[in-house]
Swiss-Prot record:
Gene name tied to this protein: MS4A2
Segments on the Extracellular face: 80-97, 151-180
Protein name per its UniProtKB record: High affinity immunoglobulin epsilon receptor subunit beta
Expression sites by tissue: Found on the surface of mast cells and basophils.
Family from the record: Belongs to the MS4A family.
UniProt KW Lipid biosynthesis keyword: no
Keyword annotations from UniProtKB, A to Z: Disulfide bond, IgE-binding protein, Membrane, Phosphoprotein, Receptor, Transmembrane, Transmembrane helix
GO term, biological process aspect, one: immune response
Topology of the protein relative to the lipid bilayer: Multi-pass membrane protein
Length: 244
């Protein structure tokens, strides 16, 4: 009887709250892991404002490059098909003789199309291809600006030497026409170069962002979470109740 009364007394005593804080188990579904939500929830610095703007305007910059290439190609086709630039003295069409309206248009059109495709499909190989193409277009654009500036100086020098004030003369008309065409192509090339450099910066930023969190580290953290979850859920390691 004494033993039974002691058991009832122990059961009637209030249980003191445990000082050890309870662990909150966070369940992670395989769908969240495969979709990359766990990777996104990891603490990572936010993107810069300028990089976010470039990412959103990637397709627009690609279209700008394509339009620049088409207009430069049209200028080159018209000048080379209508005029015999090889027999014009003064070298006022030196940029056309160098073929810049054609190979510059090829560089800008390729980089523009790759930028649009990579924005829509967002594949790794397309992003890297767009980065390489825009880097090449930046170099081609800088080279083209140098060629056009040299051509513009030669045209202005020709106009100044011959004192071209009567534009109905053939030579003066050619020099003035060359100056206007070269100025427009220079403006378009600067526009295309700005787009190519912006897309190059955007692609480089995406590459650096992708290399910040290694895949091995992510899998290691997943293994730690899985082991902790299995230990908390394993009923075999729980202490058996003490019989009083």
């Amino acid at each position: 009887m004494d033993t039974e009364s002691n058991r009832r007394a122990n059961l009637a005593l209030p249980q003191e709250p445990s000082s050890v804080p309870a662990f909150e188990v966070l369940e992670i579904s395989p769908q969240e892991v495969s979709s990359g939500r766990l990777l996104k929830s990891a603490s990572s610095p936010p993107l810069h404002t300028w990089l976010t703007v470039l990412k959103k305007e990637q397709e627009f910059l690609g279209v700008t490059q394509i339009l620049t290439a088409m207009i430069c190609l049209c200028f080159g086709t018209v000048v080379c098909s209508v005029l015999d630039i090889s027999h014009i003295e003064g070298d006022i069409f030196s940029s056309f003789k160098a073929g810049y309206p054609f190979w510059g248009a090829i560089f800008f059109s390729i980089s523009g199309m790759l930028s649009i495709i990579s924005e829509r499909r967002n594949a790794t190989y397309l992003v890297r291809g767009s980065l390489g193409a825009n880097t090449a277009s930046s170099i081609a654009g800088g080279t083209g600006i140098t060629i056009l500036i040299i051509n513009l100086k030669k045209s202005l020098a020709y106009i100044h030497i011959h004192s071209c004030q009567k534009f109905f003369e053939t030579k003066c008309f050619m020099a003035s026409f060359s100056t206007e065409i070269v100025v427009m192509m220079l403006f378009l090339t600067i526009l295309g170069l700005g787009s190519a450099v912006s897309l190059t910066i955007c692609g480089a930023g995406e590459e650096l962002k992708g290399n910040k969190v290694p895949e091995d580290r992510v899998y290691e953290e997943l293994n730690i979470y899985s082991a902790t979850y299995s230990e908390l859920e394993d009923p075999g390691e729980m202490s058996p109740p003490i019989d009083l």
